[in-house]
């Protein structure tokens, strides 16, 4: 039953558009929804009999309600998806994307290059880039993959021979590198090309990236004829060779368009309770490839939408297909942080209200001097392949039934969506089979394997230096990278893996065991029931990368903490340390077990063990590098983060070089102001 206070709050809601949020008794966000009539929509949850459905299960958990009144349904739509993206409610469709988009960067501004003193600044370079932007550079993209960026860089190298080397390398060369020998660079490092001629090549490269291919070819032809008229036949031949190279590249592009410069193609497929949105990108008339997205919480959100929409829709209104819900969620969440191109080609019709709301939101957001920063470290969104942030009025159109080239693009995107979804379903089926095989081998409960949680620990160091412990987490049939943890091991003898394992297990489970004991007679040696969402719990299985000795240490820690010893399993390397011959070592006295080389259970154990090893060794290497280069000393200075530290170390070759640099030298590094340079100078001296 819901509290009288909550029901009174529902009864007092206004008949206005807005967004509502449901929370459980633990304060966890369950669901975010929009409504054109808040009172009618929210009341429907509490007046309908949902029975034993998943919606009924969720409604029973509602303990608190929050609402936000907005001016229109369009505003409610945008606010809803912004909250979904940032707060990850349990029952909404969510598109997670841990990877930021890559961009192609051209350093400096061509118009001002002649007035710069530094050689590297007079000859801009092209580079692959992710991260925050610097206004003095130009960014082209976004690209769907690193491969697409690198392919574009190779194209520019073939046609315009622009440099790709770092400024520090460029400034210290005395003879041209191999790229010059294979005609991929014009040799600006040793003045084999004039800054003015190089600037023209940069401008031509920008025109190509912006999709102005025909205009570019015409300009190059006019330039060639001008050289010929001046009897400068060598220069005319160089321009002719550039035109031939560009024509070959354009001819080799199997997919190109003279009309559509910037288009996104969105194909949606739903099958087996999962969905895939395949996003293909066309920038500058070139098809750059595609990128699949897989939403979470699909079934719950679809049921919610279908059952609760009746509160606001006419009875004769047909239900919207799941594909439409998925596409709407993707467009609202994705293009809030990555600016859309002018045209979207979609496999499912898009709601015009969504496009109008999104266009209005982006127009308002881009009205100032600075574009909003995208999430995940992306540069400010670019309106086109030309690299300029959106300015002025933004207008987005969607085409549902395209023709000609657009139709071919959509058919290809749909085929790729089918392939990606089939791959995902096969992969998930295989992973679930592995989870079941391991549960059967270790006599774990088989009723519900989704919440089965496994944590694995590994220790890594270099001859006792920079010791790091890793903990990786597996549940719901996949690795949960957001729950990984690294532990810096201190206060032990260098190289003592047993002491390191004792320390990390105590730190990981000590507070949890203490809290369980204080909860009032909770038996830590028994397997707990599944906890409420977000509540900390002991894993069902603790894997230790090690044999009898490491497992003995884990047994001592768990005994001291009053925890269940049957959870501990060591992964001991087999004879000759050969893969597939590993044996499982148990802390509760059971005999060693060999699962068999081709066992699905062993494949899962090896997968988790290898991930723990990878996570530990990457952390150890980073810690070791900080110790050896003194980077940690730099990072202790207020205002110097990892990126600025890396730039300083790269420019001056190490902390000693930074310490010996003057303030004037320090301010030449990107991102280092005079005030920060003075602070660094004082701190290192």
Curated annotation (Swiss-Prot):
Disulfide bonds: none
One GO term of the biological process aspect: SOS response
Gene behind this protein: uvrC
Keywords: Cytoplasm, DNA damage, DNA excision, DNA repair, Excision nuclease, SOS response
Domain GIY-YIG: 15-93
Superkingdom as given in the UniProt entry: Bacteria
Name of protein: UvrABC system protein C
Subcellular location: Cytoplasm
GO molecular function: DNA binding; excinuclease ABC activity
Similarity section: Belongs to the UvrC family.
Record-linked Pfam families: GIY-YIG, HHH_5, UvrC_RNaseH, UvrC_RNaseH_dom
Ranges for domain UVR: 214-249
Region feature Disordered, mapped onto this chain: 365-391
Species, as recorded: Verminephrobacter eiseniae (strain EF01-2)
């Amino acid at each position: 039953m819901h509290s009288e206070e909550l029901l009174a709050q529902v009864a007092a809601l206004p008949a206005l558009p807005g967004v509502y949020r449901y929370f459980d008794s633990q304060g966890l966000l369950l669901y975010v929804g929009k409504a054109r009539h808040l009172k009618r929509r929210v009341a429907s949850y509490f007046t309908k009999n949902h029975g034993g459905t998943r919606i009924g299960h969720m409604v029973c958990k509602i303990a608190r309600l929050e609402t936000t009144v907005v001016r229109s349904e369009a505003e409610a739509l945008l606010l809803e998806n912004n909250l979904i993206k940032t707060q990850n409610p349990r029952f909404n469709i969510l598109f997670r994307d841990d990877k930021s988009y890559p961009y192609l960067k051209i350093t400096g501004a061509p118009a001002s290059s002649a007035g710069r003193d530094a050689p590297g600044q007079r000859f801009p370079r092209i580079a692959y880039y992710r991260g925050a932007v610097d206004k003095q550079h130009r960014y082209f993209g976004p690209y769907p993959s690193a491969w697409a960026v690198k392919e574009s860089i190779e194209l520019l190298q073939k046609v315009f021979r622009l440099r790709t080397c770092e400024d520090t390398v460029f400034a210290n060369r005395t003879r041209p590198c191999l790229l010059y020998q294979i005609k991929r660079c014009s040799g600006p490092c040793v003045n084999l090309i004039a800054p003015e001629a190089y600037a023209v090549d940069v401008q031509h490269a920008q025109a190509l990236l912006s999709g102005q291919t025909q205009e570019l070819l015409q300009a190059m032809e006019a330039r060639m004829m001008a050289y010929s008229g001046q009897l400068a036949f060598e220069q005319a031949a160089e321009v002719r060779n550039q035109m031939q190279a560009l024509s070959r590249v354009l001819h080799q592009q199997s997919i190109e368009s003279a009309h559509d410069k910037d288009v996104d193609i969105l194909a949606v497929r739903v099958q087996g309770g999962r969905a895939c949105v395949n996003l293909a990108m066309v920038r500058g008339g070139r098809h750059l490839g595609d990128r699949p997205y897989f939403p979470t919480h699909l079934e719950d959100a679809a049921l919610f939408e279908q059952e609760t929409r009746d509160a606001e829709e006419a009875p004769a209104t047909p239900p919207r297909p799941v594909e439409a819900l998925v596409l709407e969620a993707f467009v609202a969440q994705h293009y809030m942080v990555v600016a859309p191109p002018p045209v979207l080609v979609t496999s499912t019709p898009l709601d015009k209200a969504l496009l109008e709301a999104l266009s209005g939101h982006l127009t308002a957001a881009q009205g100032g001097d600075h574009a909003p920063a995208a999430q995940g470290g992306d540069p400010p969104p670019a309106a086109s392949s030309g690299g300029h942030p959106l300015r002025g009025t933004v207008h987005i159109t969607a085409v549902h039934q395209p023709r000609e080239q657009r139709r071919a693009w959509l058919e290809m995107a749909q085929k790729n969506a089918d392939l990606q979804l089939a791959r995902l379903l096969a992969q998930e089926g295989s992973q679930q089979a592995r989870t079941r095989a391991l549960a059967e081998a270790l006599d774990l409960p088989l009723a519900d394997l989704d919440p089965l949680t496994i944590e694995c620990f590994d220790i890594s160091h270099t001859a006792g230096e920079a010791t790091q412990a890793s903990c990786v987490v597996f549940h719901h049939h996949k690795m949960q990278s957001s729950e990984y943890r690294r532990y810096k091991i201190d206060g032990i003898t260098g190289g003592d893996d047993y002491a390191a394992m004792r320390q990390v297990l105590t730190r990981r489970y000590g507070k949890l065991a203490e809290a369980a004991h204080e909860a009032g007679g909770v038996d830590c040696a028994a397997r707990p029931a599944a906890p409420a969402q977000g509540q900390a719990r002991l894993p069902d299985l603790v894997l230790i990368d090690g044999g009898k000795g490491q497992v003995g240490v884990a047994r001592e820690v768990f005994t001291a903490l009053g925890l269940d010893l049957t959870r501990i399993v060591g992964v001991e390397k087999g004879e000759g340390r050969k893969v597939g011959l590993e044996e499982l070592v148990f802390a509760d006295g059971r005999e060693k077990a060999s699962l068999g080389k081709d066992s699905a259970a062993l494949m899962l154990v090896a997968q988790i063990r290898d991930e723990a090893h990878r996570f530990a060794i990457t952390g150890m290497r980073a810690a070791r590098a900080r110790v050896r280069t003194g980077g940690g000393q730099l990072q202790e200075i207020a205002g110097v983060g990892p990126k600025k530290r890396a730039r300083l170390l790269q420019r001056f070759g190490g902390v000693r070089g930074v310490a010996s640099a003057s303030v004037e030298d320090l301010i030449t590094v990107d991102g280092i102001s005079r005030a920060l340079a003075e602070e660094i100078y004082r701190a290192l001296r």
